């Protein structure tokens, strides 16, 4: 994995990071698409924050150098050539909340993971920081691997058709959340806790409403709530993840391979969660 920490380093060294405003990292990613503008947000001029960013930059570089994905056997099955996909990890500052980790492709088509280290300051004091890094690397690289293996599902994320986009969101986020969940191997997760049972019911109810919605303004709101907000309230992410956990429990790797074969209609299929 290549690492480009030039923006984070400029901030650490008190250089002018505003010079990076025109970079594609702020102009041409899902963040700028979500915001409808250049995503650059001037970072605070704070010495203590700079020191935290410096420590985070070092820890993330060390973890990335020795990265092993969570649920590697599933990666091996779904993405057999995953080791040939070598993304660049961009360590930056300048994204607004809540964009801490983003998968993207540069204008020349190269795969990138973008970590905003000021947003990562929320995790800086966690004892399990290495686990958080592994979780987010697994999550974001899964998005890149889906795009590499299944370009149509990737393109559908920006479709102008509401249901196509909802399918793509549920598919993409379902797999990314499943494979990275709590940085824990899938067989070691209890998918039937009272909390997850409640999350499944609430997410399924909201996804059902989203699938029936015809008003353009409400559709836009549903698409935002599908993948944004607090972790367990992102209904498309949760429905997709728990549906796939169901498939795993019933059919193992074969169930996940079958689910990966077609994103079309995935949101509707995700309503069949048994959890």
Pin down the residues of each PLM region.
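Catalytic glutamate of the conserved HExxH
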Residues: 136-148, 174
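Post-HExxH zinc-binding segment in Zn-dependent metallohydrolases
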Residues: 15, 78, 148-206
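Auxiliary, metal-adjacent structural segments of Zn-dependent hydrolase domains
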Residues: 53-114, 130-131
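Short pre-active-site segment immediately N-terminal to the catalytic Zn-binding motif
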Residues: 118-137
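N-terminal mature-domain "stem" immediately C-terminal to a signal peptide or N-terminal signal-anchor/transmembrane
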Residues: 1-50
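Soluble non-cytosolic domains of exported or imported proteins
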Residues: 62-69, 132, 136, 166, ...
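Pan-zinc metallopeptidase signature
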Residues: 192-275
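Extended, well-ordered protein cores
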Residues: 112, 116-118, 146, 162
